[in-house]
């Protein structure tokens, strides 16, 4: 018999917010009696944008901005119906993107 698994993937720009959310999810899943592996830190995506500071000329004067996307992976093995209900009722911060695969 194959084991059921819920895979939760979190994305956020702030690493503190994503770590707090991951801890809430792990704590909730463990309280409901499921096995948890994670949070596993995935590679951080870094996007760099270079913009010319001046409006018309002066191409040598540029400014660079970067945007970092932090990611975490959590696997919940053998979830119970109580686990799924607890995860559905969980309130997480607005800056966290959540993908759930069954």
UniProtKB/Swiss-Prot annotation:
GO terms for molecular function: structural constituent of ribosome; tRNA binding. Transmembrane segments: none annotated. SMART domains: Ribosomal_S10. It holds the Pfam family Ribosomal_S10. It comes from the Bacteria. Keywords: Ribonucleoprotein, Ribosomal protein. GO terms for biological process: translation. InterPro entries: Ribosomal_uS10 (IPR001848), Ribosomal_uS10_CS (IPR018268), Ribosomal_uS10_dom (IPR027486), Ribosomal_uS10_dom_sf (IPR036838). GO terms for cellular component: ribonucleoprotein complex; ribosome. Gene3D superfamilies: Ribosomal protein S10 domain (3.30.70.600). Part of the 30S ribosomal subunit. PANTHER family: 30S RIBOSOMAL PROTEIN S10 FAMILY MEMBER. This is Small ribosomal subunit protein uS10. The lineage of its organism: Bacteria, Bacillati, Bacillota, Bacilli, Bacillales.
